[in-house]
C-alpha cells in the first residue's frame, strides 16, 4: 500500500463480499476503506471516533438514534457524503451500493458495542487488505 495509485473501480471488482471492507490506503492514523453493501447491517456505535461515508454507486441509508431514542435516517446517493458522529448508534442499510469510508485504523466495522446477534452477511473486522 502507498506504492502507487489505486483504481477504485478495479479494487471494487476484485472482491464480491458484502459488508466486508477492504483497505485501499492508509494516511496518518486512518484507513481508507471500500465495501460492497446490501441488506441490513447491525445497530452499533463507535464511542471514540467519527465515521465518514462516501457513496460511490447506489443508495445507502444510515438510520441513527438520538440520546432520547428518536430514530432518523440519512439517505445517501452516488456522490453523497455523511459523517456519523462518535457516540451515535447507527445502522446502515442498502438495496445495493459501493461505499468508501475514512475510519481510524483499527476501528471495528461493528463498533465498540452492537445490539443483538450479527447477521451472517456482516463481517466484524477492522478491514481486510486489498488483494
What does each model-found stretch correspond to?
Residues 8-43, 49:
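A short glycine-rich, His/Asp/Glu-containing loop-to-beta-strand
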Residues 43-45, 50-55, 73-74, 90-91:
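His/acidic/aromatic-lined binding-pocket segments of jelly-roll/cupin-type domains
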Residues 2-12, 95-131:
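Double-stranded beta-helix
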Residues 36-37, 47-66:
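Short, conserved beta-strand element in jelly-roll/cupin
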Residues 28, 56-57, 77-78:
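A cytosolic small-molecule/anion-sensing beta-strand core signal
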Residues 66-86:
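Short acidic-glycine-tyrosine-enriched beta hairpin
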Residues 31, 40, 59-61, 98:
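Structural motif
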Residues 42, 61, 80-91, 107:
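Histidine-centered metal-chelating micro-motifs
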